[in-house]
Regions:
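Position-driven detector of the extreme protein N-terminus
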Residues: 2, 17, 23-26
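Bacterial N-terminal signal peptides that target proteins for export
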Residues: 2-10
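Exposed boundary/loop context
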Residues: 6, 17, 62-63
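Bacterial N-terminal signal peptides
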Residues: 9-20
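Carbohydrate-active catalytic/glycan-binding domains of CAZyme proteins
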Residues: 24-401
């Protein structure tokens, strides 16, 4: 969301807004930046070995691949693509998390719903909740597939801001829902010393009615929202999961009213947090985190917060998962334009979901081109990531590859 829009949303309070109200605000803003017409009529010729960006991608059943905000893993000789099963109308989750399979990353078979919503009233994943950004990883120790995703409880808008866990013995499911929770309740970031903790405890988020001032930002950087949510746990919205070279897994999420990123270490079974975490870019308004590691260097690509509307991507780099993280210019470059002539400084009309690495000779930036009027018809964008002479990621538009 833009600064003005997000300010209005936050001042009202997530708990006071319905999902429809919040999504309507985002849709109104998005409509001023990009035209969302009816469903695209062109389809990508991916069945003959080409992926065409900015067009519908059909599975072998002839239907558009309805898997958004997710990721791809390889198990055996098969790739599995997980993502949000989005409705054609509305914004809540009515089905669950989709899964597709492929031998070549071109021809995709619809394997159905890997994790279904519950029909039980009061369940955390009751039909009508919001399930977003699902990420599935394989745990070599437990020999199970673990799914983490952003969960909002039914009827509570975006107030819950939880991370949820599920697991399965099979890559296509069914996944068993385990629980949902806030992140790292009652725990300080591991690198936050006693003095900084005392400073954070002197802040008062409820006292700030005037957002976005210099004084307010200073309070945010002191840890105002970290302290506000300290007892109940930190918020978790857009998220990803990263497994490092040593097998350690990390949860990276947009927290503190989408103002700050958190990176948290997961337990060996990937089903809980160890309690070790820290913050990235406090007050920076980053979401949709995507991460990769190249030659010992970590690269984190995020978007800004503009609802469904595209914006300029942000990039951070570090030599350790724990930082310090340095912000660099957006990796998206070039004069070519993407979907509906969106330029590089609008991420070619898309928002990142995952970086698929170790499959092709180059990492692939996976993204969604959102269509909030028909979310099920949101398009997929895959772009190869190059590296310049200094070893910095560079992403250019390509029509197909």
């Amino acid at each position: 969301m833009t600064t003005k829009l997000l300010k209005n949303f936050l001042l009202c309070g997530a708990a006071m807004l319905s999902v429809a109200q919040m999504q309507g605000m985002a849709l109104e803003q998005a409509g001023t930046n990009v035209s969302y017409g009816e469903h695209p009529t062109a389809v990508a010729d991916n069945q003959t070995g080409e992926l065409v960006n900015g067009q519908l991608w059909l599975a072998t059943d002839g239907e558009h691949i309805n898997a958004h905000g997710g990721n791809i893993i390889k198990y055996g000789d098969t790739y599995y693509w997980y993502g949000e099963n989005r409705p054609n109308r509305g914004f809540t989750t009515e089905m669950g998390v989709s899964v597709y399979s492929s031998k070549d990353l071109k021809s995709w078979k619809n394997e159905g719903v890997a994790l279904s919503v519950s029909e039980e009233a009061g369940s955390d994943i009751e039909r009508g909740c919001i399930m977003e950004r699902p990420k599935v990883v394989y745990n070599k120790k437990t020999k199970k597939f673990v799914m983490l995703f952003h969960l909002e409880l039914k009827g509570r808008g975006y107030e819950a801001a939880r991370v949820a866990f599920a697991e399965s013995k099979s890559p296509v499911g069914p996944f068993r829902f385990i629980r949902s929770t806030r992140v790292n309740a009652g725990i300080w970031p591991f690198d936050m010393d006693k003095k900084a903790q005392e400073v954070a405890q002197q802040t008062d988020a409820a006292a700030w009615k005037d957002w976005w001032s210099k004084e307010w930002r200073v309070e945010v950087e002191k840890g105002m929202y970290l302290w506000r949510d300290f007892k109940g746990g930190q918020m978790s919205r857009d998220m990803t999961v990263f497994i490092d070279d040593d097998g350690k897994a990390y949860h990276i999420t947009s927290s503190q009213e989408n103002l700050t990123l958190l990176v948290s270490e997961l337990t060996d079974d990937f089903l809980d947090f160890t309690g070790k975490y820290n913050v990235i870019a406090p007050g920076g308004q980053n979401e949709a985190p995507c991460i990769m590691k190249r030659n010992g260097t970590y690269w984190l690509i995020c978007s800004g917060c503009t609802g469904w509307a595209p914006n300029e991507a942000r990039m951070f780099t570090a030599q350790s998962i724990w930082g310090p993280w340095k912000q660099l210019p957006s990796p998206f470059v070039g004069e070519a334009t993407g979907y509906q002539n969106m330029p590089a400084n609008k991420t070619f009309g898309a928002q990142g979901t995952y970086i698929l690495d170790g499959v092709f000779d180059k990492p692939i930036f996976m993204a969604d081109i959102w269509n909030p009027r028909h979310l099920s018809q949101s398009l997929h964008l895959w772009l190869p990531i190059d590296f310049n002479a200094e070893g910095v990621p560079v992403i250019r538009w390509v029509d197909k590859w």
